Amino acid sequence: YSATGGGLGGGHSGKVLTMWNKTLDPNSPDFKYTEPIEVASSAYDEDCDAIDAGLLLDPTDGRLWLSYGTYFGFIRLVELDPATGKRMEGNKEIDIAIDCEATDLIYRDGWYYLLGTHGTCCDGPNSTYNIVVGRSRKVTGPYVDNMGRKMLEGGGKMVIAAGNRQTGPGHFGLFKVADGVAKMSCHFEADFDRGGRSVLGIRPLLWKNGWPVAGEVFKEGTYEIESERRGYALELAVDFVRMEYTRHRFWEKDDTPVVPLKPQ
């Protein structure tokens, strides 16, 4: 978890700490969390914010990795001791991406995937959050997208963006339903049909040509299937115009009626 400072407090000073438990059953005699263990930090003038941590227990060798950071600077990677939860002695952080935040790591079929949230947040329907991905044969990188652009240079293949009257998807999470079946979580900065409130998104996690794709949540209705080989694309140039909305903060109680936002 992250503590104080960083993007949470308006500065660049932050910490990532871990607490470990042998069981999640509160009735077990082994149920007891360790004291907080600091595994990463950032100073006021550092080009990284030590928040937004993500963990990967490598299925190939049992090593434990933690990524962290925000769009204020670099995304960094450190190795932890899976037996103690502490930072591996002498471990030096590695820069693996830039211009994103809230990263997470996945291993699949010989590839390590780094998913990060790109764009701006915290402005309701005007937020531009989207989730991108790069991959590497090594957990330490370099991570590149489908066009060969390095994530250390701002690259990233799109996984999910705004759509269906929801905007600003960010903070990827993985949930394995069964062998070969997985779902992804994110939060949308604004749902236009809920007055611009932030909502949880759950999508099927699909794979296409070796890349993760956010599936659609299909509803009853009539659908049109378009051929990839002969489909058409429409390119638009759009001027940004702010959308007026009432700000709803997730940490405050809000009993106001839910009113859909008007189309822009």
Language-model-derived ranges and their functions:
Residues 221-264:
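Lectin-like carbohydrate-binding module/patch detector with strong preference for beta-trefoil
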Residues 1-51, 57-98, 107-112, 117-160, ...:
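Beta-rich carbohydrate-recognition and catalytic domains
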Residues 42-46, 93-96, 163-164, 225-227, ...:
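Short, solvent-exposed secondary-structure boundary motifs
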